[in-house]
């Protein structure tokens, strides 16, 4: 075995040990194919710089699945997920690979990115379980096809958690859970989020801090439960959640 392959295998084992889950041969092949397709498509459109080696396996795959550690212990269970702002397909496609009985909706407002997501889903054999939607979260959250229809609504947050929560909560069914993936997390952010969630008829179920392997830093996951049906006025019109965020 070459040195590169040994290092790659050791890195993979570290990730699977961290997750307490390991992919089947088919799932591993799907992840490898996904990596190849990302590299190919990156030449056409700017998707992500995290496509090589540890960048892909730790900062993309592991970062997508580690917050779902509990769900990974029972990957056979069927759930409906929606990934908001799916971009290059993480965490949504990683979840679809790891959870073979679940259905995933990938939502992004960029038609270039959703074209990529559709092609990749088909190429790696997931198009029967992945639905790709080109729409803003504020619009999709009011669409009766999607509203109150998911077990999990997920986002790797770029915006503040109180803004992201307004995008996610309207998608949840009565027992659903919103998951916000964050890097750092503070008590101030927690208090602002609590106030925002009160307006959305939701609450923080818990927060959990993870340390990514291979010195990739700290991640926080915020799990949110609905306490009642999300008020009909949310999400507000396009741009308003960012311009006038809840929680203040």
Swiss-Prot record:
Annotated GO MF terms: rRNA (guanine-N7-)-methyltransferase activity
Residues that coordinate or bind S-adenosyl-L-methionine: 85, 90, 108-110, 137-138, 156
Alphabetical list of HAMAP family matching this protein: 16SrRNA_methyltr_G (MF_00074)
Gene field: rsmG
Subcellular location per the Swiss-Prot or TrEMBL entry: Cytoplasm
Family, similarity comment: Belongs to the methyltransferase superfamily. RNA methyltransferase RsmG family.
Keywords: Cytoplasm, Methyltransferase, rRNA processing, S-adenosyl-L-methionine, Transferase
Pfam families registered for this protein in UniProt: GidB
EC number, UniProt record: 2.1.1.-
Gene Ontology, cellular component aspect: cytosol
Protein name per Swiss-Prot or TrEMBL: Ribosomal RNA small subunit methyltransferase G
Organism (species): Prochlorococcus marinus (strain NATL2A)
Organism phylogeny: Bacteria, Bacillati, Cyanobacteriota, Cyanophyceae, Synechococcales
Primary role: Specifically methylates the N7 position of a guanine in 16S rRNA.
